[in-house]
Curated annotation (Swiss-Prot):
<dbReference type="GO" id="GO:0009635">
    <property type="term" value="P:response to herbicide"/>
</dbReference>
<dbReference type="GO" id="GO:0032355">
    <property type="term" value="P:response to estradiol"/>
</dbReference>
<keyword id="KW-0472">Membrane</keyword>
<dbReference type="GO" id="GO:0070301">
    <property type="term" value="P:cellular response to hydrogen peroxide"/>
</dbReference>
<keyword id="KW-0413">Isomerase</keyword>
<keyword id="KW-0256">Endoplasmic reticulum</keyword>
<keyword id="KW-0443">Lipid metabolism</keyword>
<dbReference type="GO" id="GO:0033197">
    <property type="term" value="P:response to vitamin E"/>
</dbReference>
<dbReference type="GO" id="GO:0071560">
    <property type="term" value="P:cellular response to transforming growth factor beta stimulus"/>
</dbReference>
<dbReference type="GO" id="GO:0016616">
    <property type="term" value="F:oxidoreductase activity, acting on the CH-OH group of donors, NAD or NADP as acceptor"/>
</dbReference>
<dbReference type="InterPro" id="IPR050177">
    <property type="entry name" value="Lipid_A_modif_metabolic_enz"/>
</dbReference>
<dbReference type="GO" id="GO:0010038">
    <property type="term" value="P:response to metal ion"/>
</dbReference>
<dbReference type="GO" id="GO:0071406">
    <property type="term" value="P:cellular response to methylmercury"/>
</dbReference>
<keyword id="KW-0812">Transmembrane</keyword>
<dbReference type="GO" id="GO:0018894">
    <property type="term" value="P:dibenzo-p-dioxin metabolic process"/>
</dbReference>
<dbReference type="GO" id="GO:0005737">
    <property type="term" value="C:cytoplasm"/>
</dbReference>
<dbReference type="GO" id="GO:0018958">
    <property type="term" value="P:phenol-containing compound metabolic process"/>
</dbReference>
Length: 373
């Protein structure tokens, strides 16, 4: 493989940062362009200190700016597209989510054609496959089975339509006469250091006497460590660039999981944080069917009030289903086509994540000490 270059969108995000840190170690890599709307100062500093022979360029720009994207893609060999808005709680306007997740993906696909970028990897999500009902059990599902989300909620809908656009773009003719090859990765729920979801949950527990909120005790999930998700993207980039592997990877999607034990989301949260004295709420909780119908009732109230008042329910039907389904997938196809084997073991992932949670606990205590002085 001759010298090559890569653009990573969403490079300042949870997954994007990990991809950058791994990517700069790749052989023959000449340049990495890290694109995000805004980079935090600490991320800029971290990227500037990366030990690499490759040139690392940070670009701050909007995924909705088509002209900017075309310039960012000039001279690039591979695009890894992770930029997205993740919102399953209906916090953001629907159109904002559709603009970033769907229109933004369409924009960068068009930029790849205009700039003659031959390889495109999309960071999708298992949410594009469901779950559609907490009553339907899917354990160790795989790509040959047809699973497709039927939710109209903005996040799963936008990611599903964006993935379809990416896979449909495979085989597109580039401006220089070449061919665009694409693939999509569908990670499970991603955990690890700097997880925005874990941060919110841990800080909420610390403000609630160390009690973790119970949200998904009925689920069976196979969460995946962020380092392994990043590794899968590196292997996908290699696969699309390797003439021997590319034929099998083009136009394909892959479920990305690892060897994290299958467990409920609540059990995962407890396992990762119990060393620091955090514990699950042991009080009585609503039965799952009743919780679902309460969510439906709250969504109905929200809809009826919309002309007069913007009421956002604390939970919704999609979130209840997502958090409480038995829904797991195998990574065997990624292993077969990409050579994917988890880089980080469960024990190591658990230790690293727990240590990071410890820093959040310590920061919280320091904040309380400062306020009490």
């Amino acid at each position: 493989m001759p010298g090559w270059s890569c653009l990573v969108t969403g490079a300042g995000g949870f997954v994007g940062q990990r991809i950058i840190r791994m990517l700069v170690q790749e052989k023959e890599l000449q340049e990495v362009r890290a694109l995000d709307k805004v980079f935090r100062p600490e991320t800029k500093e971290e990227f500037s200190k990366l030990q690499t022979k490759a040139k690392v360029t940070m670009l701050e720009g909007d995924i909705l700016d088509a002209q900017y994207l075309r310039r960012a893609c000039q001279g690039i060999s591979v695009v890894i597209h992770t930029a997205a808005v993740i919102d399953v709680s209906h916090v953001l306007p629907r159109q904002t989510i559709l603009d970033v997740n769907l229109k933004g993906t369409q924009n960068i696909l068009e930029a790849c054609v205009e700039a003659s970028v031959p390889a495109f990897i999309y960071c999708s999500t298992v949410d594009v496959a469901g779950p559609n009902s907490y009553k339907k059990i899917i354990l160790n599902g795989h790509e040959e089975e047809h699973h497709e989300s039927t939710w109209s909620d903005a996040y799963p809908y936008s990611k599903r339509m964006a993935e379809k656009a990416v896979l449909a773009a495979n085989g597109s003719i580039l401006k220089n006469g070449g061919t665009l090859h694409t693939c999509a990765l569908r990670p499970m729920y991603i955990y690890g250091e700097r997880s925005p979801f874990l941060s919110v949950m841990i800080l909420a527990a610390l403000k609630n006497k160390g009690i973790l909120n119970v949200t998904g005790k009925f689920s069976i999930a196979n969460p995946v460590y962020v380092g392994n998700v990043a590794w899968a993207h590196i292997l996908a980039a290699r696969g699309l660039r390797d003439p021997k592997k590319s034929q099998n990877v083009q136009g394909q999607f892959y479920y990305i999981s690892d060897d994290t034990p299958h467990q409920s989301y609540d059990d995962l949260n407890c396992t990762l944080s119990k060393e620091w004295g955090l514990r699950l709420d042991s009080s009585w909780s609503l039965p799952l069917p009743l919780l679902y119908w309460l969510a439906f009732l709250l969504e109905t109230v929200s809809f009826l009030l919309r002309p007069f008042y913007n009421y956002r329910p604390p939970f919704n039907c999609h979130l209840v289903t997502l958090s409480n389904s038995k829904f797991t997938f195998s990574y065997k196809k990624a292993q077969r086509d990409l050579g994917y084997v988890p880089l980080v073991s469960w024990e190591e992932a658990k230790q690293k994540t727990s240590e990071w949670i410890g820093t959040l606990v310590e920061q919280h205590r320091e904040t309380l000490d400062t306020k009490s002085q």
